[in-house]
Design a protein with these regions (language model features):
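N-proximal low-complexity "stem/linker" segments adjacent to membrane-targeting elements
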Residues: 1-34
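Short, acidic, metal-binding catalytic loop of nucleotide-sugar glycosyltransferases
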Residues: 33-43
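A conserved acidic beta->alpha catalytic loop
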Residues: 34, 50-58, 99
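Short aromatic/hydrophobic "clamp" motif used to bind/position activated sugar donors
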Residues: 92
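Short, flexible, basic/aromatic active-site loop/helix in glycosyltransferases
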Residues: 123-129, 137-159, 163
Length: 259
């Protein structure tokens, strides 16, 4: 709480670290704890966006003293855009509340963003082992997934971007804004829009590797089924990974108006 209060006093932060929260009362504290423990030798601000939560998320925000804003239009695009509108930093670091960040995460991203010609940065993520997901199974899954992402990033880095590990130049991000008409992919869409204006830097370092929840990984049931589903999808699109693409057609089931 003291660290959050001190951070709120930074009137000219170099980086804005922005969480989006929808019903995250049980995860908010651990996420903020990891962010407050980050080692930074430059001023930052930590902002949170309460995205139409129906649990005690807002009450926890008030109790912790984090600077936050309410966004009543539900969806990650709306929440991230709200945070972008409020950010004061030259660089913008996107944060998911169900994720834990290593102590040099912010510094590692900002160091790359400060290099000439860099538009955005993105990094890798791991999952926390539990009763449904063994450490060994996750190791193999992540190793093969990381290999796929490294190959894919050569020509189509925008497809490797995830909002929980995404940073960018704030001014450039505001030029395009986050898409609010899609259910997922607002982060990669913004990265694609920024692609002609600078490099999309893939950070492989463990200093920027986060620990996150399972999200869509659980939609396919077991870890094996998740791996099989993604492997089939990867093989189907293997040829296209080696060609650049500047535009993607929206899938009907990903459009909010059809939801």
């Amino acid at each position: 709480k003291k660290k959050l209060r001190k951070l709120s006093e930074n009137k000219q932060p170099l980086a804005s670290v922005v969480l989006i929260c929808h019903n995250e009362e049980t995860r908010l504290l651990s996420c903020l704890w990891s962010l407050c423990d980050n080692e930074c030798d430059f001023p930052i601000e930590i902002l949170a966006v309460n995205n139409n939560s129906t649990d005690r998320t807002e009450a926890v925000m008030q109790q912790l003293g984090v600077t936050y804003f309410n966004e009543t239009k539900e969806g990650p695009g709306h929440a991230r855009q709200c945070g972008l509108n409020q950010a004061k930093g030259k660089y913008h670091i996107c944060i998911d509340t169900d994720t834990i960040y290593p102590s040099r995460y912010i510094k590692t991203h900002v160091k790359q963003l400060m290099k000439p010609g860099v538009a955005c940065t993105f990094s890798l993520w791991s999952f926390i082992p539990d009763e449904r997901h063994s450490a060994t199974g996750l190791w193999w899954y992540e190793a093969l997934r990381d290999l796929h992402l490294r190959i894919q990033s050569i020509q189509r880095p925008e497809l490797c971007v995830r909002g929980m590990t995404f940073g960018f130049n704030t001014e450039l991000g505001r030029k395009f804004g986050f898409r609010t008409d899609i259910i997922r992919g607002e982060d990669g869409s913004l990265a694609l829009a920024m692609k002609p204006y600078g490099k999309l830097v893939f950070i492989h370092s463990g200093k920027a590797r986060v620990m996150t929840g399972y999200g869509t990984l659980n939609n396919d049931g077991s870890l094996f089924n998740s791996f099989k589903t993604r492997l089939v999808k990867a093989f189907k699109g293997a040829g296209s990974m080696f060609t650049r693409k500047n535009e993607y057609k929206d899938e009907d089931n990903n459009l909010i108006k059809n939801k």
